[in-house]
Amino acid sequence: MALQMFVTYSPWNCLLLLVALECSEASSDLNESANSTAQYASNAWFAAASSEPEEGISVFELDYDYVQIPYEVTLWILLASLAKIGFHLYHRLPGLMPESCLLILVGALVGGIIFGTDHKSPPVMDSSIYFLYLLPPIVLEGGYFMPTRPFFENIGSILWWAVLGALINALGIGLSLYLICQVKAFGLGDVNLLQNLLFGSLISAVDPVAVLAVFEEARVNEQLYMMIFGEALLNDGITVVLYNMLIAFTKMHKFEDIETVDILAGCARFIVVGLGGVLFGIVFGFISAFITRFTQNISAIEPLIVFMFSYLSYLAAETLYLSGILAITACAVTMKKYVEENVSQTSYTTIKYFMKMLSSVSETLIFIFMGVSTVGKNHEWNWAFICFTLAFCQIWRAISVFALFYISNQFRTFPFSIKDQCIIFYSGVRGAGSFSLAFLLPLSLFPRKKMFVTATLVVIYFTVFIQGITVGPLVRYLDVKKTNKKESINEELHIRLMDHLKAGIEDVCGHWSHYQVRDKFKKFDHRYLRKILIRKNLPKSSIVSLYKKLEMKQAIEMVETGILSSTAFSIPHQAQRIQGIKRLSPEDVESIRDILTSNMYQVRQRTLSYNKYNLKPQTSEKQAKEILIRRQNTLRESMRKGHSLPWGKPAGTKNIRYLSYPYGNPQSAGRDTRAAGFSDDDSSDPGSPSITFSACSRIGSLQKQEAQEIIPMKSLHRGRKAFSFGYQRNTSQEEYLGGVRRVALRPKPLFHAVDEEGESGGESEGKASLVEVRSRWTADHGHGRDHHRSHSPLLQKK
């Protein structure tokens, strides 16, 4: 039985035995192959290790690819900065050609070097870099430093010209070029209508920065300057909105036809994008102004708040497909008025110069990249398209200028003359904006992109080099109306006063104009906005606040430049220094030291401290504040003493004589008693002079007054004639110490008119009293009294 079973299942057993043998042989082959592969790899690694040199710590290594982009960009900016320095060292060169010409030439030089060495330039310009990093600083600088008053006075004409002018130029150039493209002989049949309209929108973006520099030097009238400035400020935003809308239409046309509904939706979007961007900017401007209200203890971050909120308004608007350019412009205009009131003077200086620096760097990079792009093989030259583009730019610019200003002149009090319109037409210079938009055209939608870029470069070179250089001689040839000289503080105050007066007259007459609108906005601003957004309580009167701003500005200029300003409240220019200088005797030096000790401002002892988040005030800022405080105190005392007539008595015009000191109040005994007991005890310094005020009879105290007015300078002027203190005491008292001019530091008495009839006829009512200033001097006052009493013409009747 067992044998039978073995015989029966023997074939299967044999098959199983064969399979087992095959598996064992296969596994042995795999093991051998794996071992051979591992042995081969090991041998190869050892061979490679033996062939390579041994690595160690190298003293010098070169990895240029790692730093190529920032390194070359830094060199570009440094080269342009050095070129600017050399450009402005020769004072005649800026008057002959604009600065943008220099930057383009530097870029062309760099491009020639790159092209000659067959080196690939770094990707400085693409869509994200331009719109997110290069464009915002340029727009922010233009909006922040915009002169708000003349801009809003001409806001109607500026909007009329900037918006409609950009639309007319874009549509006119695009339609005209589309007609040229229909001519088969020119070989432009593949350029459709949308592509021509898009090119017309980007080529109509003007950049009259060079023209504005020429206008500033030529001092053209204010309204002409503001029209060009307003066009430069708003034209970029309008052009970019139109550019993006036509890009969307081009993408849509690639897959489907454009209908009338799409065109109407695009027009509505144009309005929504512009107004939405402006509203976003206003909101962010108010927020930034409100936050700077609480930064008095951490002033180091004040510039950061200004820049971050401005940039955030741009990014937030772009996130919602609104106009970021108009948003950052509105934010800058809104925040400037309130931020300057809250931040410190050091922070304001930082904001001003850092903003200028960022704008200059961005424009430099764009112009240099324009010059780099000029030299190369990425151009398509079509004579017909380029020449007609240049011609249509000039033709449609002229049509839009003369047509729009003919209409606007019908509603203006001061219309633009034909000469002004010619200058506006000639100032249509294309620049960085047009080139950037042309360079960023998507190649998938524009197969003839190289031709568009070439035509844009030709238009830019023509307008910058030809029109930018010749606009100065044209202004002088046409004899365009010039602006007046720089207004003084007195003129500024009277202009503000006349604004209030005109607003009141318009309110009475029922007339409505920008004076009344501005006056209502100021009331709303003082009632609500300033209380919320500004930290300090400034004077309620706008005239007083304007005076304070102008005084602070003038004081800072006096400190920084060292030159006394020529405005209405400036100190008169001093006499020239005497050439011969004598050596002073020890007695003279001691007398000078005594006088200076009793008259000069004492240095206040302060405990020095350090705060990481606050900037140390500059010396010029302290000096400016000290000058402002002294000047305000002087003016306050002058206004207080300026009531020279007896109380309650009308002014007379006869028998006027002049005294050295003004009258007080003769009818108030209590006021005289308080004045007699008043003394300056606020000064904690022991060397400061004590000042007392006393009321006494004008006639009885005349000799004492004369004795106290004379400074004992005769002992310091041995061999000289006694010095007479006449009319000079009203401005600045000068003594010559051994041939050296010195200004006496003592209170400045003012001369006031007194009615002599009131003196002679009012003996029974009480004599006029004189508030005199008694200064305690260390030297003897007796020298020169008789001479002064006998020769002073101010104490005699006229």
Swiss-Prot record:
Location of this chain's protein in the cell: Basolateral cell membrane; Apical cell membrane; Zymogen granule membrane
Residue ranges within the lipid bilayer that do not cross it: 14-28, 70-90, 421-441
PTM characteristics: May be phosphorylated.
Keyword Transit peptide in annotation: no
Residues listed as glycosylation sites in the UniProt record: N342
Membrane topology (Extracellular): 116-127, 176-196, 248-270, 326-356, 406-420, 442-450
InterPro entries, A to Z: Cation/H_exchanger_CPA1, Cation/H_exchanger_TM, NaH_exchanger, NHE-2/4, NHE_CaM-bd
General function of this protein: Electroneutral antiporter that exchanges sodium for protons or ammonium ions at the basolateral membrane of epithelia to regulate cell volume and intracellular pH upon hypertonic conditions. As part of transcellular ammonia transport in renal tubules, mediates basolateral ammonium extrusion in the medullary thick ascending limb, regulating the corticopapillary ammonium gradient and overall renal acid excretion. Mediates sodium:proton exchange in gastric parietal cells secondary to cAMP-dependent acid secretion and hyperosmolarity.
Subunit structure: Homodimer; each protomer has one site for sodium and one site for proton binding. Interacts with CHP1 and CHP2.
Similarity section: Belongs to the monovalent cation:proton antiporter 1 (CPA1) transporter (TC 2.A.36) family.
Protein's name in the database: Sodium/hydrogen exchanger 4
Source species: Homo sapiens
